[in-house]
Amino acid sequence: MENIAKILRLAEEKILLVQNLKDLQEYKVEFLGKNGIVTGELKKLGSLNEQARKEFGLKINKLKDKIQNTIKVKEEILEEQELNLKLAADKIDLTIPARKYKQGSIHPITQCSEELIQVFSKFGFTINNGPNIEDTFHNFTALNFEDDHPARQMHDTFYLKGQEDSKPMLLRTHTSTVQIRAMKNGNPPFRFIALGRTYRSDSDMTHTPMFHQIEGLVIDKNINMGHLKYVITEFIRSFFENSHIELRFRPSFFPFTEPSAEVDIRMNKNDQWLEVLGCGMVHPNVLKNVGIDSSEYQGFAFGLGVERFAMLKYNIKDLRQFFEGDMRWLKHYNFGGFDIPNLAGGLTK
């Protein structure tokens, strides 16, 4: 009994003074391990008679339980202490300046495209798409281009090699090709825009070999030039968010429209007129080429360059800057993901 009490007292003293989990584990082995002090006491059971063995075994088990409980309590205390020390060491100093967060931005062409789509959607226009590689029928013939029209020549259009003698293929020069495919494969009425890349052999401050274009088409019964002028006028004023913009429609010529017009705008009375888009009533030959009766259905079409509208709205001087990938230039505009317009929020950044 005295030896058991002495062992318990010694164990409690050592465990009480221990300062870390490593030393606590060593004391656990010292008292409860295979060759520990308590295990040594258990070995004495073999030399005792049955009654003494029973009494001594009960006392040894109680000793073992008390030491285990003492170790467990101390272990919890030390673990909490170590956790607090770690948290204190890892504490974030909120006064330290944060790391600069690099975030991408929306390209001005994408931003402008989304704004254009948003405006046209208010007039009930949907979006149609088509292939970038086209044949001459969809790109020229169906749109009433004569066989000797200059636009068909190599110096204006990118033709694909190896197709000259069979079915000439080319990079589309306008998204009007989407209109032809949609009218061939569907039935009127139509009201949609076609947005996408177009390609022409030209490069200077106001032209690039590849550019983005939106072309719109409306086909229905009793459509006239008044409808066209209304849509274009409201579209221009909505996009530039200026109800006082002046517009003028100048007579022009396009193979696929008759009559045709160029649209000029000026923001203020003292500004110069700026040409922004072409439009007109769909030519009867175009309707005939896609199987639509021009005596029953009429329509209007218009086309505009996305880059051109972006340059006017965001005051960009050189068209080529859109494609140079200059991060400083892109950062200057810094359109964020939340700047993409929606019908509820409007266009203003």
From Swiss-Prot:
Mg(2+) binds at E258. Its EC number is 6.1.1.20. GO terms for biological process: phenylalanyl-tRNA aminoacylation. Its main location: cytoplasm. CDD domains: PheRS_alpha_core. InterPro entries: aa-tRNA-synth_II, aa-tRNA-synth_II/BPL/LPL, Phe-tRNA-synth_IIc_asu, Phe-tRNA_ligase_II_N, Phe_tRNA_ligase_alpha1_bac, Phenylalanyl-tRNA_Synthase, tRNA-bd_arm. Pfam families: Phe_tRNA-synt_N, tRNA-synt_2d. One of its GO terms (molecular function) is phenylalanine-tRNA ligase activity. It is found in: Cytoplasm. PANTHER family: PHENYLALANINE--TRNA LIGASE, MITOCHONDRIAL (PTHR11538:SF41), PHENYLALANYL-TRNA SYNTHETASE (PTHR11538). Belongs to the class-II aminoacyl-tRNA synthetase family. Phe-tRNA synthetase alpha subunit type 1 subfamily. This is Phenylalanine--tRNA ligase alpha subunit. It comes from Rickettsia canadensis (strain McKiel).
